[in-house]
């Protein structure tokens, strides 16, 4: 380990005893590193039930931490300073708060944020979205493997996406990380336990950590690593990638997240095992992008493998950015598709909320820009959309083109209440953008004016629910509303409000349904009666005059409302048409520019290839001509000097002049032959006919030469 660098993987991976129980099972979501294929490899689920529990022994080899230790108060902080609340409602059953559970559609849970007691206004304390804080770990044990030390197994079945364990350790900055790499290497530590938390920050579990440090590597793992925001800090957890059976070893892919020493031999024995893991240069083992980023971009494992195979065929090295574990070249090559489902939007937003890399952010934003489904745009807003875009405006503060795209996208978002805009402070951020980029003032000012027209409402709080009657507010939390609808307070009572449609209802809108969180509740969706009905008031009979007057006023009001609604609808349709036309033009420009660049790159590549081919062909031709000319020169050089000997003795021409004449004659004769046919080779021997022709040419040449020589002597 003399050459220490930011290289993936550290400790040897899982070995598998041959005498253990084996189950064949196909894992549909397994990430593999074999040849590109949509079909996952067959994974043999080996169970280690008979292996002795070594948990206590393993705990004696390091300092077991309750929580991560931070080298200073700044490390581990997420980028957003404001806590993001969910919109779930407290749901106590049998003394336990079931709010924000796995199937609750909790916006914090969907975007990898844990709820915090007393900070989330409505979901209540100790909700189901506090797995890191409550240390709700899976039932696991440490055992001894045959090939490389400790491993971790499941002591009971673990369902897909279940939280297994938090990866704890000392959270340090990059300078300290590099120092420790060298220090551990000098101390001859066999295994390092580093994980990148975020750019420039690492978790070191080498000396202080948790049982998660013993999870080994596999080329076809059953677990994955994800980063969650917990009370303003980024924390790293290991989650089940598929259902894990009792007795199975828990593994994840070191090449995605782990940092440490040089490449090491891999013992996972998976069908797709590439034989080693780690090292700075990524090869077959490389996951080119972190799993959450790849999923958010819609990139399949087969696409990564195909790209790796292509690069290997071209003899190119495949390297990741040391700082962020991302292959930028692969990222740039990805074809971006729009978000088509709410799940697509959720994956994109969860990454954007933690994003630091501008290139990744641009690619993810393109997925949103290309999406035109209004229901999905409502989903963007719901998943802390305004908070997310406030951060993105800060991230791209110096890049005017990207800011312009973001502002136009914000203009496309459907109307909602003003509450999200106020809480995220996005209006102040847009004003800051306009101040620093005057060319964006028009769209920015338009956006601010649009938001000013939005209505602000008091949202239902936990206190409102506690003070309400059982037939009303306590059951409101059971209702799952269609996209664009919210429950707000107006004049002390709840209303169903749709800002886009400018509609308020006393009753749940069409499409409303019960939420998942309250399966045991049998209360119907509430319908709010007027005060007189609640008090069982008696309705007085109207006189004929009163009845006609009310009827006339009602008809006038209805006609006026219909006329106003038609005018508003016409204006809304015109504005929407103009907005869609403008957005369509922007998208067409983006696509055209991308196609132009792609075509330009293709033409440049074709030009380079043609130049290389022409140069090679020209060089080849010149080489062939040069060789042929050399052969003819040798051919004539074997004859001409002998013919010239008599001129040297008879005519008394000096030796230097005679040598020069021989060179000139040979050169002329060779050139003549090349001119006739450059591909024709000279004969092996000089024929009589050829020798005769050479003599004739030599005599003619020498006569002219002697004539010139005589004239020269006469002048002198």
Swiss-Prot record:
One function term, GO molecular function aspect: methyltransferase activity
InterPro entries: AWS_dom, Post-SET_dom, Set2_fungi, SET2_Histone-Lys_MeTrsfase, SET_dom, SET_dom_sf, SETD2/Set2_SET, SRI
Keyword Cytoplasm: no
Compartments, record wording: Nucleus; Chromosome
Domain WW: from-to ranges: 479-511
An annotated GO BP: transcription-coupled nucleotide-excision repair
Coiled coil region boundaries: 539-628
Functional note: Histone methyltransferase that trimethylates histone H3 'Lys-36' forming H3K36me3. Involved in transcription elongation as well as in transcription repression.
Listed name of the protein: Histone-lysine N-methyltransferase, H3 lysine-36 specific
Organism (species): Candida glabrata (strain ATCC 2001 / BCRC 20586 / JCM 3761 / NBRC 0622 / NRRL Y-65 / CBS 138) (Yeast)
